[in-house]
Design a protein with these regions (language model features):
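Hydrophobic transmembrane alpha-helical segments in integral membrane proteins
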Residues: 1-16, 135-139
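N-terminal signal-anchor/start-transfer transmembrane helix
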Residues: 9-30
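Transmembrane alpha-helical segments of integral membrane proteins
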Residues: 21, 193-198, 219-223
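Cytoplasmic-side transmembrane-helix entry/capping segments in multi-pass membrane proteins
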Residues: 33-42, 66-69, 92-103
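Membrane-interface helix-loop-helix modules in multi-pass inner-membrane proteins
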Residues: 48-97, 201-214
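Hydrophobic alpha-helical segments and helix pairs
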Residues: 84-134
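Transmembrane alpha-helix/helix-exit interface in multi-pass inner-membrane proteins
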Residues: 134-159
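A mid-sequence, solvent-exposed acidic-amphipathic segment
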Residues: 155-199
Length: 223
């Protein structure tokens, strides 16, 4: 990983952090704020993140992806989902937390290039990986919402000062976001499993066809 690549990997992190900061500033003044500036900066981060990912995994034979690239892809899903949601729903500090998480995962892009890469020659496997990353991203959003919601609920029950938790959206919004992320995540995860089964079935069929062809060829040579 070159110094230039390292520097480029920090660009989406900087953009995501910038968007998160803009959200926090806006929410301090108005809890229902949906700052356009944060949406624009977050979307810029998503675009740069996508460009870096494409550069890292694109290869002449199709797609070559490392473990760190998979994690970065999950981060891209989190960042893209949050950037879109920012324009429609006041998620408060929840969106800031998710953007920071997306930025941290973006720094993993190409980190282990050449060391743990796996070639993905078949479109079925590419679709499976993409759907799995989408499901993982949405389920990560759900887990983040659960943790923050639990912390928020514990503070309310203990009647302690909310502190920075006051910047989170109302519990109803948190719960709705949680269930939407879980529902979408499991639907996409089911699709990922289906595409995985298709790929395995196709792989087995190809293996059997190759085995039969090899057996027939060896039989012909004996005759």
């Amino acid at each position: 990983m070159t110094i230039l690549h390292t520097a480029l990997a920090l660009v989406p992190l900087a953009l995501y952090l910038g968007a998160a900061t803009l959200v926090v500033r806006a929410v301090r003044a108005d809890p229902t704020a949906r700052p356009l500036s944060a949406v624009v900066v977050a979307q810029a981060g998503v675009l740069v993140h996508a460009a870096l990912l494409f550069r890292a995994i694109d290869s002449p034979g199709g797609v070559t992806i490392a473990i760190t690239d998979s994690a970065s892809l999950v981060g891209w899903v989190i960042g893209a989902t949050t950037a879109i949601a920012l324009g429609f729903t006041a998620l408060g500090a929840l969106s800031s937390v998710l953007l920071v998480l997306a930025g941290l995962l973006a720094t993993l892009t190409g980190l282990l290039g050449g060391l743990s890469e796996v070639d993905v020659p078949h479109w079925e496997l590419t679709a499976h990986i993409a759907l799995a990353a989408l499901a993982a991203g949405w389920l990560t959003i759900a887990v983040t919402a659960v943790l923050l919601l639990s912390w928020q609920d514990a503070r309310v029950r203990a009647r302690k000062p909310m502190g920075s938790l006051a910047l989170l959206p109302p519990m109803e919004t948190m719960e709705r976001t949680l269930f939407q992320a879980i529902g979408g995540g499991f639907v996409v995860l089911t699709l990922a499993l289906v595409t995985g089964l298709f790929f395995v079935h196709d792989l087995i069929a190809q293996h059997l066809a190759h085995k039969v062809a090899s057996h027939s060829q060896s039989g012909s040579e004996k005759v």
